[in-house]
C-alpha cells in the first residue's frame, strides 16, 4: 500500500466517524456495525501496517464517499462536516504536542482493553468509558467542538456519549493520518490525488 493510499484510508476513517456523529446528532439512532468499526480503530494502538487499524474495510466506503463529496469538484460540500473536520484536526495538533495527554490516552485505552474481556465494544458501559476519555483528555486541549443537531436528541445522555466516543474514533484516524505525513495543505494542493485514490477504493 502506497503512502497516498494509506493516508487516504486514514482520512476516510476520520470522515466515517464524523458522518456518524452528524447522523446521531440529528436522528438519535446509530448503525451498530458502523459504530463498532470506528470504535475498534481506537483499540489498535501498535499496528504493524496502517491497514491493520481498519479491520472492517466495508465500513470505510462511507468515508471514501465523503472524500468525494467534500474534496471533489461537485457543489454539494457539507459545511457542517468541514467545520467538524477543521476543529478535530486542530485538536489533534494540540494532542500531538502534549506528551502528558498522549500518556494518559494510552493508559485509559489499556483500561478499555481489559473491559473488552467482559463486554462488547458497543456495550453502553464501554461507550461511556470511551466518551469519558474524550471529555477528560481531548476536549480540554482546545476549543470544544460544537455539535449541531436536533436539540431533543442531543439532550439524551447516551447520544452525548456516543458522539464523544465517535469523536475519539475520529481522533484515532486523525493521529494516524498525521503519522503518515498528512497535512492540512494536502487537502488543497493534493486534492485531486486524494479524490482519485478514494474513487479507486470505491471501485474495488
Swiss-Prot record:
It is a peripheral membrane protein. Its main location: cytoplasm. It comes from the Bacteria. It is found in: Cytoplasm; Cell inner membrane. SUPFAM superfamilies: YcfC-like. Pfam families: DUF489. Disulfide bonds: none annotated. GO terms for cellular component: cytoplasm; plasma membrane. HAMAP family: HflD_protein. PANTHER family: HIGH FREQUENCY LYSOGENIZATION PROTEIN HFLD (PTHR38100:SF1). Belongs to the HflD family. This is High frequency lysogenization protein HflD homolog. It comes from Shewanella amazonensis (strain ATCC BAA-1098 / SB2B).
Amino acid at each position: 500500500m502506497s503512502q497516498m493510499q494509506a493516508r487516504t484510508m486514514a482520512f476516510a476513517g476520520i470522515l466515517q466517524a464524523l458522518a456518524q456523529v452528524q447522523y446521531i446528532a440529528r436522528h438519535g439512532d446509530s448503525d451498530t456495525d458502523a459504530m463498532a468499526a470506528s470504535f475498534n480503530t481506537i483499540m489498535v494502538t501498535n499496528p504493524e501496517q496502517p491497514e491493520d487499524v481498519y479491520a472492517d474495510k466495508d465500513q470505510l466506503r462511507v468515508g471514501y464517499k465523503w472524500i468525494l463529496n467534500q474534496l471533489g469538484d461537485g457543489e454539494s460540500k457539507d459545511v457542517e462536516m468541514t467545520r467538524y473536520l477543521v476543529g478535530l484536526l486542530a485538536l489533534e495538533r494540540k494532542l500531538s504536542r502534549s506528551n502528558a495527554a498522549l500518556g494518559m490516552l494510552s493508559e485509559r485505552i489499556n483500561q478499555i482493553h481489559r473491559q473488552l474481556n467482559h463486554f462488547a465494544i458497543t456495550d453502553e458501559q464501554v461507550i461511556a468509558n470511551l466518551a469519558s476519555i474524550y471529555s477528560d483528555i481531548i476536549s480540554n486541549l482546545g476549543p470544544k467542538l460544537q455539535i449541531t443537531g436536533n436539540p431533543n436528541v442531543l439532550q439524551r445522555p447516551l447520544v452525548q456519549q456516543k458522539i464523544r466516543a465517535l469523536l475519539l474514533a475520529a481522533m484515532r484516524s486523525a493521529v494516524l493520518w498525521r503519522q503518515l505525513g498528512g497535512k492540512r495543505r494536502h487537502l488543497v494542493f493534493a486534492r485531486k490525488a486524494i479524490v482519485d485514490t478514494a474513487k479507486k477504493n470505491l471501485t474495488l
